Amino acid sequence: MKVLGKELLDNLLGDAKASPRRRAHLNLHKTFDDKVQRLFIALSKGSYVEPHYHELPHQWEMFVVINGVIRVTVYNSDGSKLKELLVGDGEECRAIEFQPFDIHSVECISDDALMLEVKEGAFDPDFAKVLLTSG
C-alpha cells in the first residue's frame, strides 16, 4: 500500500515553485512499461504547457484537479482555439479527458494547483507529445 500524504504533496508544490518550468512531477507507477501511468503534477501560477497532442492510438490522458485551478485550451489543427475552460476548485469541471490527437494546452491560473494524471502505458519518451507549430 502507498500512502501519499500532505507533506509529500506540499513538498511537490514547493519543488514546482522552485522549478524554472513552475511545475514538478511525481510518478506513482514503477516503470514507463507499466500499463497504467499515474502521476501527480504540481504547478505554480504561470506554468504553461504549450499546445500539443499525443499521436499514438493508446495515448489518451485524464487530468483530475485535486486543488487549484488550471485553464485548459483545446485547438484546431490550424492553431485556432476551439474551447477554453477552467478546471478545478469552484469550477463546474473538476476533471478532463483527452483522446489521441486532441490538441491542448494547460496553464495554472491559481497560486498553485495539484492534479493527478492518468494515462495508458507503456510510455515511450520518443513519442511523448507533438508540439503544435505555427505555419
Model-derived features: positions:
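A short, N-terminal "cap"/entry segment at the start of jelly-roll beta-barrel domains
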Residues: 1-37, 84-89
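Double-stranded beta-helix
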Residues: 3, 80, 105-135
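His/acidic/aromatic-lined binding-pocket segments of jelly-roll/cupin-type domains
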Residues: 40-41, 59-65, 96, 106
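Conserved short histidine dyad/triad with adjacent acidic residue
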Residues: 40-59
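Short beta-strand His + acidic residue motifs that chelate non-heme Fe in jelly-roll/DSBH
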Residues: 51, 72-74, 96-98, 104-109, ...
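Glycine- and acidic-residue-biased ligand/ion/polar-headgroup-sensing regions
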Residues: 58-78
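Short acidic-glycine-tyrosine-enriched beta hairpin
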Residues: 62, 76-104
